[in-house]
């Protein structure tokens, strides 16, 4: 009987547990903000410190992931996240504690993708592994969010202890992932100038340029849409229960998971440019929310947004890793992708928060989110036909 999972399955399991806890924490932080009477703007602030960790540390984490063995890097990331939870248990400021969790997450991220070319040989195997990793991550995001909301209602301390136990299990599973050699020659000096140089290299390559703009605009639209739906559901559908809203938001994630699973049957890595049409569909579905007034229709469109989004993003991720692996190294590529995606999200969520403060109507923000995504997709379509 084979009790020890295959290296890829060990990675998927470790990633599932890790992402599950990452998403529990945001809802627990929400509970802590309510319990300790922090002001209302604190949740976006907590989210921002997390995104900021990604933006600030990007130049160094890719090097760290490529220099060391990736399976060790995954452990370091989870140990730092555990420290962040201990800070929350010790009643430290939630924005600071969540920022520490963000540091762990940003270290973890390049390694989980960067180890894939080492474990999955060949383009098609890499696309399949990507598709599965993305699907497991999304299921973890959905179930983790709901578990976080549910547990933090019962007991915040208990839910934090559950997080620590799960991280320890994930660290244990990491020991089953084989060690890749790593590249000891990588230096941390000149990290910023070389990071900028690597970014220029990726943006000069047509494939990776397309993928970076594509994934960045997808995550920006998703992050803003999530914030808007929080306000849109009570306003338009008259539903105010937090648990219900989290379930409605979860529908998009289910759509993304479906999209990620069916992608390999629709698009190959070489046809990555066809993904732009699915981005177009996603943008149109977001704009449709200006006319939606009933729950069943909203659910159908959220499912569609997710599904189109999943097909939009998975081939671009695989394409970017393929180019990166051949040019600047897998870990550095993911670090630049993280930097681009989180900068896009930071700008999107920041603009939305500002608009909200200035009293701009939620429908105007919704229209803006759809139009901005469509503008980026139009740019991708122009890019495709410009150099044929």
Q: PLM ranges: what are they?
A:
Residues 1-8, 179-212:
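Juxtamembrane intracellular "pre-TM" segments in multi-pass secondary transporters
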Residues 39-47, 240-249, 330, 334:
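Juxtamembrane helix-start elements in MFS-like secondary transporters
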